[in-house]
């Protein structure tokens, strides 16, 4: 929504005042919250900052973890460009099955499936790092587009070697990888590797540019280098 496009949040918040206020805050900033669910069975999660700035999560369990597959309206993807999700809510509770339903619905309607692991942020929501890493890796092949950061490399692959790590991800549906480091931005397909100096290009702006190409998930592997450069520059 901040990039001038249409964005909708599919999730569940607590029915307490904080959850309602959060929904109103997002809606006021252009996010479509008409499909947000609310529950009285759990509260909206809260993140505090510790003395050293570390995230302290209150989630016991929280509202979004109880967001069940039957609450998701698959028809919402009929006119969607993409489904985007992170690792924060992939725990083995109803919400993981809801993600799988959303992925299937997006694919059925021809929408891109985009996965941004966001390991550094997601770690605060998981009980331990091994299960987070294993689950994140299970979801990689489900995506058409992967949106990765430098901070994802070591937690995911135990290595900072970029090409070794990223090219191993081209399995099943994965056709395009956007990778942002402190000094460069990279774009990988199965046949092309491009890079440019870090220019502040965000994953959201990258997806907006991808949308402007009017392409489809099954056409990604055939995009020529000159077309791919339009996504970076």
Predicted regions and their residues:
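Charged helix-capping and loop-helix junction motifs
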Residues: 96-102, 127-135, 159-166
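Structural recognition of alpha->loop->beta junctions
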Residues: 27-34, 129-155
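Conserved phosphate-donor
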Residues: 145-155, 164-198, 230
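Conserved post-catalytic alpha-helical subdomain immediately downstream of the catalytic base
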Residues: 191-233
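A short helix->loop->beta-strand "cap" motif at the edges of active sites that frequently abuts
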Residues: 106-112, 171-176
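A short, histidine- and acid-enriched strand-loop-helix "catalytic/donor-clamping" loop
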Residues: 118-125
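A short, aliphatic-rich alpha-helical micro-motif
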Residues: 76-78, 137-140, 171
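Conserved N-terminal subdomain of the carbohydrate kinase-like
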Residues: 6-87
